[in-house]
Each structure stands twice: as structure tokens, then as C-alpha cells.
Regions:
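Secretory-pathway/luminal and periplasmic proteins that interact with or process carbohydrate-rich
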Residues: 1, 53-58, 103-108
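CBM-like carbohydrate-recognition segments
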Residues: 16, 96-213
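Extended ligand-binding groove/face enriched in aromatic
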Residues: 1-31, 41-42
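Noncatalytic carbohydrate-binding groove/subsite architecture in carbohydrate-active enzymes
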Residues: 22-23, 27-66, 72, 77-93, ...
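Short clusters of hydrophobic/aromatic residues that line enzyme substrate/ligand-binding pockets
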Residues: 4-6, 62, 113, 218
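C-terminal outer-membrane/trafficking sorting elements
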Residues: 216-246
Length: 246
């Protein structure tokens, strides 16, 4: 197979892999945007070409099996390449790859992002996808149909996680691997699951507080923090912790 690619690791025989090529493509695009050095754009395009010609599938999968973090990283890489070059092929792919993660049953369970595993890296996958999905939603040049779908899906996932958090246990309030069920107290808490849950709530909050989201036609609730009282609120306005006043 001809083209520029990176191996999964340094072991002999390690071949090209979406988990290295996707972030490499994204990083090269970001470096070009930062420094304007043409070689970075050349690398980004070559990584994109290898991914689309040899690894990504025509139905929207970035790899087999499809994993949320590579759907997100390669989708974000495509979005940035569109803004750099103005070429519509990148815009089209960005929408297809990120939308797949939220709408296809290979990445979802009962309409929510699925449980992808309990290891430290697997439990972090959704933490990678979420900010890139929100970036897509807030990008006025991306397809409005995909943006509307993603805004709704992100809110649905955030609502499910919030419903299943044991808020009475705060601050020992742990996120589950799958947001459609409560954290199992018989199991050790996962920092990866916590990172994914925090990424979801933080980035949905960012999405809800941005004016461009309103242009999608989707109403998004948001509760601004009360900086004077120090109170801590949830996205739906529930008081989590009473602040102290001096």
C-alpha cells in the first residue's frame, strides 16, 4: 500500500492504524494553522489520503471496529482541513464521521454512546470524541442537518448521565462507563469514565452557552454559575453545593 502512514507502535511488523493516523492528521493540520509551514499541510493531506483510501469505510466508519475517539479525531481533522483548503470533500467527511459515532448502532446502545471497555484507554474514548462533536455543532460552516442531529444527541447523552449521577453522594459522585445506567458502587471508580463524563457535561455546557447553537433551531438550557455566591449548579439549575460568603 502506497502512501504516508504511521505504525500503531514501534514493534516490528506494526502497520498503519487509525489510532495513530487520525490524531497525526489532526495535529499536522493544527501545526499548519499555527505556523503556516507548508510541510505540515502536506503531511495532513497525505495522512488524510491514506486514511480514506486504505482504512476508513464508505459507510462512515473510520476503522473496524468503529471507536468513538477515532471517529472524533479524524472528523475534527477533516473539519480543519476544510477550513484550511476550502475543499468540500473535507467538510463532507467531517460530518459523516462524527455523525456516525452518535447515530450508528456500532457506536451506540439504546440511543446513547456505548460502553467501550473498562481499561484506562477504552474508558477515555468518549472524552476525546465529545469536544470535537461540539466543535462541529458550533461551526456555522458545517452542515445544518448534521449539526441539529448532533446537538440533540449530545443533549440526550448529557441528560442521561445527569439523571444517573448520584448527586446525594457529592463529592463522591462517580460517572458510569455507560451513561444510560447508574454507577455500580460495587466496582472501583474509573478515572477514565470520570474524564469522559466530565468531558460530556463541560462541553455540552460550552455548546449551550454559545450563540451559534441557537441557529440550529434547537433550544438548549443552560444555567450560568453564580460567581457572587459561590453556589455550584447543574446544567438544569439544580443547586449542587451551597457557596460560602465571607
Amino acid at each position: 500500500e502506497k502512501g504516508l502512514w504511521l505504525p500503531w507502535n514501534t514493534d516490528n511488523g506494526s502497520g498503519p492504524n487509525a489510532c495513530t493516523l487520525s490524531p497525526a492528521c489532526l495535529m499536522a493540520a493544527k501545526l499548519y494553522m499555527k505556523y503556516g509551514t507548508e510541510k505540515y499541510l502536506d503531511y495532513a493531506k497525505k495522512f488524510y489520503d491514506y486514511m480514506t483510501n486504505h482504512i476508513a469505510k464508505s459507510d462512515g466508519r473510520v476503522e473496524e471496529p468503529p471507536l468513538t475517539y477515532t471517529q472524533g479525531t479524524f472528523g475534527e481533522a477533516c473539519r480543519l482541513l476544510y477550513h484550511i483548503t476550502g475543499e468540500s470533500k473535507y467538510k463532507m467527511k467531517a460530518g459523516v464521521y462524527i455523525n456516525y459515532a452518535f447515530t450508528n448502532g456500532r457506536c451506540t446502545h439504546n440511543g446513547l454512546l456505548r460502553h467501550e471497555g473498562t481499561s484506562m484507554d477504552q474508558s477515555l474514548f468518549k472524552a476525546v470524541l465529545i469536544p470535537y462533536a461540539v466543535n462541529f455543532c458550533l461551526d456555522e460552516e458545517m452542515q445544518i442537518t448534521y449539526r441539529r442531529t448532533l446537538v440533540t444527541a449530545l443533549q440526550k447523552n448529557a441528560d442521561a448521565l445527569w439523571k444517573n449521577l448520584d448527586k446525594q453522594a457529592y463529592p463522591k459522585m462517580y460517572c458510569p462507563y455507560y451513561w444510560g445506567e447508574a454507577y455500580n458502587t460495587a466496582e472501583a471508580a474509573s478515572m477514565g469514565a470520570m474524564a469522559s463524563g466530565a468531558s460530556l457535561l463541560e462541553n455540552v455546557s460550552r455548546m449551550c452557552n454559545d450563540r451559534t447553537t441557537q441557529e440550529t433551531g434547537i433550544k438548549v438550557p443552560f444555567m450560568a454559575p453564580d460567581t457572587q455566591s459561590g453556589n455550584v449548579y447543574s446544567l438544569d439549575g439544580t443547586l449542587l453545593r451551597q457557596g460560602t460568603t465571607d
